[in-house]
Amino acid sequence: MRYKVLALDLDGTLTNTEKVITPRTKAALQEAARRGVCIVLASGRPTVGIEPLARELELEKYGGCILSYNGGKIIDCRTGQTLVQHAFPADLIEPVCTFSRYWNVVPLTYDKNGIVTEVPDAPYVLEEARINKIPVRKVENLPAEVTYPINKLLLTGDPADMPHVEELMQQEFAGKLSICRSAPFFIETMPLGVGKDTSLEILLRAKGLTPANLMACGDGWNDLPMICLAGMGVAMGNAQPPVKAAANYLTADNDHDGVGLAVEKFILNEET
């Protein structure tokens, strides 16, 4: 079997617009897992927001992994062991929050229970809470509150403003942070050099594998690096144009079993 690791973005990829895994896709993934494929749920979501889908796919039984915080952390679902961990630079939390306030975007991070932010009723903070089914805790000063290690800061704001904000942020924190959008209203900020691709490379090496053994499916800007890394990069029918351009294969959209169809084709049927 050529593809021994299968990395899947969640929102816009694995799940449909109702945030549900469709039956055909679920069946294809469980059969792939039974055949020994390591399924990696690779998302910008916090770990707690990925765990329900991991349980639904029985990844603890088959030895799959959770890649959370856009590559900030990887956990082995069977053992609970943390395989990869990247901490956000503590000295950059205050500058990122100051930048965010100036440009009228709302930063958030996470604790063991849910979201932590200064503006709990901001619309895209509430969207992040809805996606992950986690509570929001209000704090007066986010940098002062974060006295524990975090994996990322997420900036939320109006989709019309975010391309410009991302560009400015890339300039402001060049050489200090990895920055990308995961949705029109989200900007991910991670430790420098961290992404889905770099953490997947660590996982592959630990398994004695190479990117040629990786199949990755995604739709968003933050999926582009892992799509480029993978021996088989699959873009969803609803993917952003750069993802489609970089992919080896274009599948159906996330409402029409795009992941399931690709898994059937390249893993279960081993087409080339």
Model-derived regions: residue spans:
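Mg2+-dependent phosphoryl-transfer enzymes with acidic/Ser/Thr/Gly-rich catalytic loops
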Residues: 1-5, 22, 188-272
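Asp-based phosphoryl-transfer active-site loop
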Residues: 2-18
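Active-site phosphate-binding/coordination module
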Residues: 23-124
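Hydrophobic packing residues within well-ordered alpha-helices of enzyme cores
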Residues: 25, 50-54, 165, 169, ...
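Short active-site oxyanion
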Residues: 36-40, 64, 152, 212-213, ...
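Short, hinge-like loop/turn segments at secondary-structure boundaries
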Residues: 56-60, 84-85, 124-128, 196-197, ...
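Short, structured coil segments at secondary-structure junctions
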Residues: 57, 62, 70, 173-175, ...
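Conserved acidic, metal-coordinating active-site core of Asp-based
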Residues: 99, 103-217, 221, 229
